[in-house]
């Protein structure tokens, strides 16, 4: 329930489906109300609906048949309290809660997923005519009676779309599960609290009991505010997953308002803090455990059910997706086109700096603690390493910001600024790794020495609530990891490594700071959450040493963000751009501050904007990111045989393809335009990758069916089946509507890889084989890379003719590649295909990333590619031990 719709009379159209949607007149004339549209294009006025609390518990609202059943189910939980043994009651309510929670996440989840992908619920309604007044079946009548009991006797079921009526019934199913889930959880809380003579108020000091109750109640009230605010924002339509069934018109994108502007997915994140408030009040690890269990299942539900549907309905278009892919890959151009090491993530064994980082991390995190004599020495090492990292990084960033010392040194030594930035990223990450490895090593040493002495709690500032401390500590550590990855996802590796300090702004495609991702909610998410993992370690091991480390991490983080990064970002983007309110700030001002204070703050902000002295805020600039199968092995084996001294004859390949079995058949397939390897008759015919293949067919007129069809296959995948094709053609097929005809296989109808292939004629829309063509080979064209750049134009023309023209259409060798390639459904796959064809044709291996690291003004042309290949050849020849022995890279 995270669809953030602006109001009930608006929603979002899927840009991929709009062109196929036709809008008809409303089926029910209603004077007022939001307008809805089904996925088939039928429009209607959406009647008013009420939330589940009002419909179930408001005595002034008439109850429908299903609602009475739901209330009966809810009150039936009271029967469990007739059992005198409280422990048995706890077990029963836990079992009931697990049942309803699984029904929610996997029952409702399954229905919604299939409704989203296959329109399942609506199809059921149509299949069984559930809303047809003429259907007198028991199920249909009960469903229709339920609809009328909800909407009133005057409600015309047939005049409303089946999608809306199906949604009304689905809502009751949701009400039953959600309310039962919550009620059984509350029963677990109550039974756990009164266990052992009301243990939740016993065996603790007076102030601690009241602190728990007050804090827990605060969490519950905050949870209630989140739910109410969310419902007021998204209304019943999104609360009950309405856009799985139909859409509401006039809302073009997701709206971030209210609590949805405060945190991502509030219904699933902060929308469950009340569960932990109940656990705190009940003073029960059992309640805490089932709260974690329920919350975890909700996050799975969000990830696998809601997010895919949100992306499908509200997500970016194909062009936007292609752009995002390209920009994320462009972010790597400063790091040699490889994801840089962040911590130990993106580790690459072929990168020396990664191996050094791993060795140092293991040394400081494990080896040194194993041989250390005292915790004091480990503490000194950790503090020293943190001070060294803080001073060196902060000083380097300050000098670079004000004096550009790194850039000046790099340019004076003819080192590209991108390379100097890459070196800085390695240094920065290495120092960060050393500080966290030292911190981990200090705590490992503490654990080993205390375990060896037989005392596990000695030296701790407090030792109570161990399991709670571990849970909260691990939660804080996880939060830091999540925040860090969210930051990288929003601003890229460029922003993570302070790219604004090293790369000129004029060389970037983005001129403004990002307000996407986690930065939508917080201006500086790393201000606190960037070091909350250290706080988590302190909670788990609350020692003086860890407390000092927390102070060091927090102070350094505060100084770096507020006194170094902030001033640099203001210089780049200006104070007004940097100091805009975050989502959390806006929400607090709008919902939690009195109106008088809001007006006063608005006046102050207007004054400070005029005078250019807004409060401090900073954000890094975004870099505009928001085993081969057995058959393939056989194919490679055939190719290897062909290239070996023992040639595989055409006759043997024909036998392998079983073409001879159809020599006397009345059906015929002939392939036009194939070339001969040589004048020898036993050589296999071939064509080149991407070249269209024309196949002609002849079939007996009396036996011909318009559903006869031809498919293209690898012979190594079909050689075991002569009379029936079991393998899918994967779209490489065409109908044979006439007894005689021809068809050109090109583009997606072709295989774009080397191998030996055949065409198969199938009968009457089935997979029965009537004829198998002669085998033919698809292989790469051979292109020789010239020695000199003077020949680049002629070489580029060959590349255009033999490779590029088969994939994308360019007018000449000087036309930019990217604008044409970006028009495809998957630009990355296009680049991969072109780079693969070039590699096989020229025997110089390149990757698709060559098209992402483009030339001047980001307009890489075929001529530029030709020059790059010539340069690569020169480098390879110079590195070869024998200049006559050309290397295949």
UniProtKB/Swiss-Prot annotation:
Residues 85-91, 195-205, 283-284, 376-377, 445-470, 549-889 are cytoplasmic. Residues 1-63, 113-173, 227-261, 306-354, 399-423, 492-527 are lumenal. It is found in: Endoplasmic reticulum membrane. Pathway: Phospholipid metabolism; phosphatidylcholine biosynthesis. Its EC number is 2.1.1.17. Coiled coil: none annotated. The chain crosses the membrane at residues 64-84, 92-112, 174-194, 206-226, 262-282, 285-305, 355-375, 378-398, 424-444, 471-491, 528-548. One of its GO terms (molecular function) is phosphatidylethanolamine N-methyltransferase activity. The keyword Ribonucleoprotein does not apply. It is a multi-pass membrane protein. InterPro entries: Phopholipid_MeTrfase, Phosphatid-EA_MeTrfase_fun. Pfam families: PEMT. GO terms for biological process: methylation; phosphatidylcholine biosynthetic process. Keywords: Endoplasmic reticulum, Lipid biosynthesis, Lipid metabolism, Membrane, Methyltransferase, Phospholipid biosynthesis, Phospholipid metabolism, S-adenosyl-L-methionine, Transferase, Transmembrane, Transmembrane helix. The keyword Transferase applies. GO terms for cellular component: endoplasmic reticulum membrane. PROSITE patterns: S5A_REDUCTASE, SAM_CHO2. It is an enzyme of class 2 (transferase). PANTHER family: PHOSPHATIDYLETHANOLAMINE N-METHYLTRANSFERASE. Catalyzes the first step of the methylation pathway of phosphatidylcholine biosynthesis, the SAM-dependent methylation of phosphatidylethanolamine (PE) to phosphatidylmonomethylethanolamine (PMME). Belongs to the class VI-like SAM-binding methyltransferase superfamily. CHO2 family. This is Phosphatidylethanolamine N-methyltransferase. It comes from Candida albicans (strain WO-1) (Yeast). The gene is CHO2.
């Amino acid at each position: 329930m995270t669809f953030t719709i602006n109001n009930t009379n608006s929603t979002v159209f899927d840009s991929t489906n709009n062109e196929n949607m036709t809008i008809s007149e409303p089926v029910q004339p209603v004077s007022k109300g939001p307008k809805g549209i089904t996925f088939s294009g039928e429009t209607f006025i959406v009647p008013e609906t009420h939330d589940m609390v009002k419909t179930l518990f408001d005595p002034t609202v008439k109850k429908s048949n299903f609602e009475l059943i739901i209330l009966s189910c809810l009150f039936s939980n009271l029967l469990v309290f007739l059992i005198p043994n409280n422990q048995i009651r706890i077990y029963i309510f836990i079992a009931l809660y697990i049942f309803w929670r699984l029904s929610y996440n996997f029952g409702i989840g399954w229905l919604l997923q299939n409704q989203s992908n296959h329109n399942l619920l609506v199809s059921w309604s149509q299949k069984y005519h559930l809303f047809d007044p003429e259907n007198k079946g028991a199920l249909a009548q009960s469903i229709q009676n339920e609809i009328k009991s909800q909407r009133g006797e005057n409600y015309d079921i047939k005049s409303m779309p089946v999608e809306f009526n199906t949604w009304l019934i689905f809502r009751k199913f949701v009400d039953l599960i959600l309310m039962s889930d919550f009620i059984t959880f509350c029963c677990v809380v109550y039974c756990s609290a009164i266990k052992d003579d009301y243990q939740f108020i016993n065996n603790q000091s007076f102030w601690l009991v009241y602190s728990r109750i007050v804090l827990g109640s605060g969490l519950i009230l905050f949870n209630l505010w989140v739910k109410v605010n969310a419902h007021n924002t998204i209304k019943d339509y999104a609360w009950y997953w309405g856009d799985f069934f139909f859409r509401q018109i006039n809302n073009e994108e997701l709206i971030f308002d209210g609590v949805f502007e405060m945190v991502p997915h509030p219904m699933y994140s902060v929308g469950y803090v009340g569960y932990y408030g109940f656990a705190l009040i009940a003073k029960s690890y059992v309640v805490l455990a089932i709260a974690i269990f329920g919350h975890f299942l909700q996050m799975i539900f969000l990830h696998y059910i809601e997010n895919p549907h949100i992306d499908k309905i509200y997500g970016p278009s194909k062009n936007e997706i292609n752009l995002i892919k390209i920009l994320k890959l462009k972010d790597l151009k400063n790091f040699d086109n490889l994801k840089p090491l962040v911590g130990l993530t993106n580790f690459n064994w072929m990168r020396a700096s990664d191996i050094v980082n791993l060795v140092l991390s293991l040394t400081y995190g494990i080896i040194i603690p194993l041989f250390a004599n005292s915790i004091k020495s480990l503490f000194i090492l950790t503090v020293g390493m943190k001070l060294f990292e803080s001073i060196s990084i902060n000083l380097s960033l300050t000098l670079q910001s004000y004096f550009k010392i790194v850039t000046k040194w790099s340019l004076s030594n003819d080192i590209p600024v991108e390379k100097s930035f890459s070196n800085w990223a390695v240094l920065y990450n290495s120092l960060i790794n050393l500080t966290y490895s030292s911190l981990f090593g200090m705590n490992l040493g503490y654990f080993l020495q205390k375990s060896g002495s037989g005392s596990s709690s000695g030296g701790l500032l407090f030792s109570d609530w161990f399991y709670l401390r571990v849970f909260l500590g691990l939660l804080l550590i996880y939060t830091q990891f999540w925040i860090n990855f969210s930051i990288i996802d929003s601003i890229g590796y460029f922003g993570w490594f302070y790219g604004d300090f090293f790369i000129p702004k004029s060389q970037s495609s983005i001129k403004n700071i990002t307000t996407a991702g986690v930065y939508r909610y917080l201006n500086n998410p790393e201000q606190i959450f960037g070091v909350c993992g250290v706080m988590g370690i302190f909670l788990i091991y609350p020692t003086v040493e860890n407390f000092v480390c927390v102070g060091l991490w927090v102070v350094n983080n505060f100084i770096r963000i507020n006194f170094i990064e902030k001033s640099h970002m203001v210089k780049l983007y200006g104070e007004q751009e940097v100091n805009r309110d975050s989502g959390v700030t806006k929400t607090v001002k709008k919902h939690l501050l009195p109106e008088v204070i809001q007006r006063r703050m608005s006046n102050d902000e207007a004054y400070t904007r005029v005078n250019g002295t807004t409060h401090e805020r900073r954000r890094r600039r975004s870099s505009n990111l928001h085993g081969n199968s057995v058959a393939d092995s056989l194919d490679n084996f055939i190719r290897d045989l062909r290239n070996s001294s023992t040639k595989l004859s055409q006759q043997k390949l024909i036998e392998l393809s079983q073409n001879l079995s159809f020599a006397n058949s009345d059906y015929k397939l002939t392939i036009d335009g194939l070339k001969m390897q040589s004048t020898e008759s036993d050589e296999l015919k071939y064509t080149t990758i991407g070249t269209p293949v024309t196949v002609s067919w002849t079939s007996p007129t009396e036996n011909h069916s318009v559903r006869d069809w031809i498919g293209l296959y690898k012979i190594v995948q079909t050689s075991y089946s002569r009379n029936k094709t079991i393998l899918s053609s994967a779209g490489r097929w065409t109908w044979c509507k006439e007894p005689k005809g021809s068809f050109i296989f090109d583009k997606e109808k072709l295989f774009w890889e080397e191998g030996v292939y055949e065409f198969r004629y199938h009968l009457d829309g089935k997979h029965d084989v009537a004829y198998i063509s002669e085998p033919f080979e698809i292989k790469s064209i051979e292109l020789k890379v010239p020695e000199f750049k003077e020949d680049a134009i002629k070489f580029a023309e060959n590349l255009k003719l033999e490779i590029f023209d088969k994939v994308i259409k360019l007018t000449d060798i000087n036309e930019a590649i990217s604008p044409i390639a970006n028009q495809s459904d998957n630009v990355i796959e296009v680049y991969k295909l072109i780079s693969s064809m070039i590699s096989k044709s020229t025997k110089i291996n390149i990757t698709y990333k060559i098209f992402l690291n483009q030339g001047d003004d980001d307009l890489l042309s075929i001529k530029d590619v030709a020059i790059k290949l010539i340069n690569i050849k020169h480098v390879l020849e110079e590195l070869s031990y024998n200049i006559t022995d050309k290397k295949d890279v």
